[in-house]
Amino acid sequence: MFTMDDLNQMDTQTLTDTLGSIFEHSSWIAERSAALRPFSSLSDLHRKMTGIVKAADRETQLDLIKKHPRLGTKKTMSDDSVREQQNAGLGKLEQQEYEEFLMLNEHYYDRFGFPFILAVKGKTKQDIHQALLARLESERETEFQQALIEIYRIARFRLADIITEKGETQMKRTMSYGKGNVFAYRTYLKPLTGVKQIPESSFAGRDNTVVGVDVTCEIGGEAFLPSFTDGDNTLVVATDSMKNFIQRHLASYEGTTTEGFLHYVAHRFLDTYSHMDTITLTGEDIPFEAMPAYEEKELSTSRLVFRRSRNERSRSVLKAERSGNTITITEQYSEIMDLQLVKVSGNSFVGFIRDEYTTLPEDGNRPLFVYLNISWQYENTNDSYASDPARYVAAEQVRDLASTVFHELETPSIQNLIYHIGCRILARFPQLTDVSFQSQNHTWDTVVEEIPGSKGKVYTEPRPPYGFQHFTVTREDAEKEKQKAAEKCRSLKA
């Protein structure tokens, strides 16, 4: 691997020898790039080399295109092309497949006067075959420009294979783009079964007859810098293509959870587009609930009619990045959002600081209305994909745990409530490392304090602003609570 410093210090001949194979049998591009030094980054080098091609006359560009091999054939080609085609599966074609590729390539060459070119890295032989069929329908000028675009992509991949930017001291900039509100609905996804059952919840699985998800996709990588600085879209994956990619892969997903779907899509994105360095996917579930049905004089649950739920919703977040040939999950968590719970009594708030700024009265028994966002992380992210359903933690179970603890606890504060909810979740699911909370206090204001003949009261919405809390409950917290409970049990027995 070479660094930018290495390339900038080479003499012209050494640089030409080093970069001569980046463009197929066209070392003249590397030779001319020597005069454009210094190169500040891989993207800068790629931009300058492609700029040389763009500035060349039409005949020179056509000559460059014609130097590329015909995909899927056995004709002589450069070592780089051999390796790229083998990785795409073109080196192991069955005889019938080989003859099909040979025929289509000849048809393409006869139609346009130059070979079919495609940056095959990350693609399968099926992808290549489909692209060849589709592009046979194009106009010549469209294909001429597309051939150059594919050559630029190939050059980018080849540069990334031999150049490292490790050790460069420039600060990494924020640079990403993506697509939001990618709605996808799937019927008859594989059911989620075999989850661990807990005392606080009746949840036993999901039939997944109707599944909805709202996905946000954000990608990053140095390859996209020219699109910002120069308006060069050569390596840009259109956000509309991202939308199509996500929606169509919901059809081929064979798992049972949103977490697993995001993992599947992230890997497919990075496998397909090898110039992407990072991807962040957020999937918010769109829940559907089966409606009642009256069949054969009995009330049952419909297997056909579902109601979209407007209650709390679950969300999953996954971040992945490329490191060489390895894809690493850098962050993954699951979350239940906008869980709104009210407990009509058994809540207090007393003993807080009272000074000249205090107007809030102490209350030994009040209703408490809380909004909760609860997120959890696994020690092993593979557990979130439900390959072993018994180690998967469902949002429905977290919801039921939260309401159960709220019911059981004499609540002295929201802070104490979320602490005990978190400890209970970690006690039930030892595969989790921590549980985080974002909570808000939306307790109602009293309108009528006493109603004759009733213990009820009348309330209204609270005046803004609202109080909030952020807190993470750790595995250590849960262990401390477990020890305290054991000590209390021993003291009672004594």
Curated annotation (Swiss-Prot):
pH-related activity note: Optimum pH is 8.
Any one biological process term the GO annotation gives: allantoin metabolic process
Pathway: Purine metabolism; urate degradation; (S)-allantoin from urate: step 1/3; Purine metabolism; urate degradation; (S)-allantoin from urate: step 3/3
Keywords: Decarboxylase, Lyase, Multifunctional enzyme, Oxidoreductase, Purine metabolism
EC number: 4.1.1.97, 1.7.3.3
Residues holding urate: 239-240, 349, 366, 414-415, 441
Cited CDD domains: Uricase
Catalytic reaction annotation: 5-hydroxy-2-oxo-4-ureido-2,5-dihydro-1H-imidazole-5-carboxylate + H(+) = (S)-allantoin + CO2; urate + O2 + H2O = 5-hydroxyisourate + H2O2
Temperature dependence (free text): Optimum temperature is 37 degrees Celsius. Retains 90% of its activity after 72 hours of incubation at 20 degrees Celsius or -4 degrees Celsius, but loses 50% of its activity after 12 hours of incubation at 37 degrees Celsius.
Active site residues per record: 68, 179, 190, 239
Gene3D superfamilies per UniProt: Oxo-4-hydroxy-4-carboxy-5-ureidoimidazoline decarboxylase (1.10.3330.10), Urate Oxidase (3.10.270.10)
Record's note on what induces expression: Expression is very low in excess nitrogen (glutamate plus ammonia) and is induced by TnrA during imiting-nitrogen conditions (glutamate). Expression is further induced when allantoin or uric acid are added during limiting-nitrogen conditions.
PROSITE patterns: URICASE
Additional information: HIU and OHCU are unstable, they spontaneously decompose to form a racemic mixture of allantoin.
Family according to the record: In the N-terminal section; belongs to the OHCU decarboxylase family. In the C-terminal section; belongs to the uricase family.
Name recorded for this polypeptide: Uric acid degradation bifunctional protein PucL
Native source species: Bacillus subtilis (strain 168)
